[in-house]
Regions:
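Conserved ABC transporter NBD signature motif
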Residues: 76-85
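Conserved signature/switch motifs of ABC ATPase nucleotide-binding domains
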Residues: 153-156, 174, 181
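ABC ATPase NBD coupling module
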Residues: 86-102, 126, 132, 245-249
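Short coil-to-helix segment of the ABC ATPase nucleotide-binding domain corresponding to the Q-loop/switch region
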Residues: 114-121
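ABC ATPase "signature
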Residues: 239-240, 248
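A short, surface-exposed alpha-helical micro-motif characterized by mixed small hydrophobic
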Residues: 221-223
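Conserved ABC ATPase "signature" region
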Residues: 84-85, 121, 125, 132-149
């Protein structure tokens, strides 16, 4: 009994590293008022990797810049990082607290006339640290990001992925507790993106970093984040555990985001442009099936064929893993007796498989 109480206490006590309360950001451009961020409140736990996603113009980059006050929120908005209310600090105190927050960007922002190690040394230059200790620190960081062999190279001699590794090492120079990543993989190819994701995972685990990831790339969110907030038109329309958000989206933008990044979204393209390829006959039904958890691995299609005597042709399929939980779907053509097809689709609905009829002949 005592053990259960202790476990409950541990689970309930989760330290909040970043607390955003009623954050708004308004711009005036050519007499037009633009609400880039609209009354957003988010809590990000210590040591977690939190994603903020949305389509272009959703306000996610503006929001993340409010965390370290590169953008000041409108009056009434409060930003607290590691227990310190940044929005209440004077400029000197804010500069000191910003050393707890590292940041990387899409375009690296390296100094081209300085070597790799000189770029990493730059944040340490005016911190009263002995030169020898600075070099030791920078060398250790470059080893951590797997760039020990590139210390004396210039940025022009590096690939995009290597440049981002230098930027990460530089962002970690002052031992921050938080790392903000603003579209950090958007300029990289898929393989390099994967490598940067794996590096961020390693840093999160090794350094106990709290990482905030701003992205429009679904694969980055799926592979990296434990929780996510979805933004549209400056608002957070949905947030929670990544599996819960994407397996059962509550907002239209989350559904559109998933469709835009899923292989199953090609079904609409097939219908509009290549209907002859589908070769739908009289009575056929084209349907999209979405399922989660154990349903992904169950023989759903073969069971339907056997039970209802309908022919099912799989046109598209997609399966993803969200923190070890499978989520997926298929686009299929159902052929056979009309009543049998209706019964087959109805049985799927009873088994918690979402059915969306896309076309029927």
């Amino acid at each position: 009994m005592q053990i259960n109480k202790q476990l409950t206490a541990i689970l309930l006590w989760v330290r909040i590293m970043i607390h955003l309360e009623h954050i708004s950001k308004t711009y005036t451009r050519k007499k037009e008022i633009i609400k880039a961020v609209d009354d957003v409140s988010i809590d990000i736990k210590e040591g977690e990797i939190f994603g903020i996603i949305g389509f272009s113009g959703a306000g996610k980059s503006t929001l993340v810049r409010c965390i370290n006050l590169l953008e000041y929120p409108d009056a009434g908005g409060k930003v607290t990082v590691d227990g310190v209310k940044l929005t209440s600090l004077n400029s000197k105190e804010l500069r000191r607290q910003r050393s707890n927050i590292g940041m990387i960007f899409q375009h690296f922002n390296l100094m081209p006339s300085r070597t790799v190690i000189e770029n990493v040394l730059y944040p340490l230059a005016y911190k009263g640290i002995k030169k020898g200790d600075q070099i030791k620190k920078a060398t250790e960081l470059l080893k951590l990001v797997d760039l020990s062999d590139r210390i004396d190279n210039y940025p022009s001699q590096l690939s995009g992925g290597q440049k981002q590794r230098v930027a990460i090492a530089r962002a970690l120079a002052l031992d921050p507790k938080v790392l903000l990543c603003d579209e950090a993989t958007s300029a990289l190819d898929p393989q390099t993106t994967y490598e940067i994701i794996e590096l961020l995972k390693k840093l999160n685990e090794k350094l106990k970093l709290t990482i905030v990831v701003i992205t429009h790339e679904m694969d980055v969110v799926k592979d990296l984040c434990s929780r996510v907030a979805v933004m549209e038109k400056g608002k957070v329309v949905e947030q929670g555990e990544i599996f819960n958000v994407f397996s059962n989206p509550k907002s239209d933008v989350t559904t559109r985001f998933m469709k835009a990044t899923s292989n199953l979204s090609k079904a609409e393209i097939l219908i509009k442009r290549y209907k002859d390829f589908l070769n739908l006959h009289n009575g056929d039904v084209l349907a999209r099936l979405s399922y989660i958890g154990k349903g992904v691995s169950e023989p759903i299609i073969s069971s339907l064929t056997e039970k209802f005597h309908v022919a099912i042709n799989i046109i598209l399929a997609d399966v993803a893993l969200l923190h070890g939980n499978p989520i997926g779907g298929t686009v299929c053509i159902f052929s056979g007796d009309k009543e049998a097809i209706e019964n087959a689709l109805a049985s799927l609905d009873k088994d918690n498989v979402k059915v969306e009829v896309l076309s029927h002949e």
